[in-house]
Curated annotation (Swiss-Prot):
UreD, UreF and UreG form a complex that acts as a GTP-hydrolysis-dependent molecular chaperone, activating the urease apoprotein by helping to assemble the nickel containing metallocenter of UreC. The UreE protein probably delivers the nickel. One of its GO terms (cellular component) is cytoplasm. Required for maturation of urease via the functional incorporation of the urease nickel metallocenter. This is Urease accessory protein UreF. InterPro entries: UreF, UreF_sf. PANTHER family: UREASE ACCESSORY PROTEIN F (PTHR33620:SF1). Belongs to the UreF family. GO terms for molecular function: nickel cation binding. Keywords: Chaperone, Cytoplasm, Nickel insertion. It is found in: Cytoplasm.
């Protein structure tokens, strides 16, 4: 990947990107407080499951489709996969987060003069739809885009765990290090999934997100 494209990807996955993803826990706060996911080992196992069985079978295959569609300027496919992603969110909390962060990224990309971003301010947009628009515009290759997407998600989840648990910084880094091979394996596996097999349901994750919507005391947005 060209150095400038690499820098653009680093910008896109930075926690400093002003899209508000830090405000959401994706059910992890409830899982820690009420679901017994309260040790570094359990955090690792939870995140590994969501990455490999959830994001890897739902978001990543569509990421590749969206990159192709943006490259071909195929707006029918872009709209179709955007709607598919929103429909795949298993709880209201996950749907609201996806639309909120997607709109925030659309606004940012518009302000950065990325062509094609502005129309998404007026319609429901999945984060991944705008993420792939940015990657296509900045010549970020598909594998790097997929790894970057997973890494951004994972870092945010580790931040959630650090704020909710007494999770030491070194323990958090150990989790990240252990999950790096999972990210590469998940991206490779996602390239082999046939379109009719896109999608997955994780009942435990969905229940954690649903319960977080009504959690009495919480740090993260619902």
């Amino acid at each position: 990947m060209p150095p400038l494209a690499l820098l653009k990807l680093m910008n896109l996955i930075s926690p400093a990107l002003p899209v508000g993803a830090f405000a959401y826990s994706q059910g992890l706060e409830w899982a820690i407080d009420h679901g017994g996911i309260d040790t570094p080992e359990k955090i690792h196992d939870w995140l590994q499951g969501v990455i490999s069985q959830g994001l890897g079978k739902t978001d990543l295959p569509v990421l590749f489709k969206l990159l192709q569609a943006w490259g071909a300027n195929d707006h029918e496919q872009i709209n179709s996969w955007n709607a598919w992603l929103l429909a795949a969110r298993e709880t209201q909390e996950l749907l609201d987060e996806d639309r909120h962060v997607g709109k925030a990224l659309a606004k940012l990309l518009r302000d950065l003069n990325v062509p094609g971003a502005e129309p998404w301010l007026e319609r429901p947009a999945s984060l991944l739809t705008l993420w792939t628009l940015a990657c296509a515009h900045w010549d970020i290759d598909a594998e790097s885009a997929a790894l970057g997407f997973l890494w951004s998600w994972l870092e945010n989840q580790i931040a959630v765990a650090g704020k909710t648990l007494p999770l030491a910084q070194t323990a958090a880094q150990r989790i990240l290090q252990r999950l790096m091979p999972v990210l590469t394996e998940t991206v490779a596996a996602a390239t082999q999934i046939k379109e009719e097999d896109f999608g997955a349901s994780l009942p435990g994750w969905a229940m954690a997100c649903a319960n977080h919507e009504t959690q009495y005391s919480r740090l993260f947005r619902s």
